[in-house]
Amino acid sequence: TPSQDFMRF
């Protein structure tokens, strides 16, 4: 999800 996409970093 786009909301969690930043968490992949």
UniProtKB/Swiss-Prot annotation:
Top-rank lineage group of the source organism: Eukaryota
GO biological process, one term: neuropeptide signaling pathway
Modified residues (Phenylalanine amide): F9
Family: Belongs to the FARP (FMRFamide related peptide) family.
Species per Swiss-Prot/TrEMBL record: Calliphora vomitoria
GO cellular component labels: extracellular region
UniProt KW keywords: Amidation, Neuropeptide, Secreted
Protein location: Secreted
Protein name (Swiss-Prot/TrEMBL): CalliFMRFamide-2
Protein function: Able to induce fluid secretion from the isolated salivary gland of Calliphora.
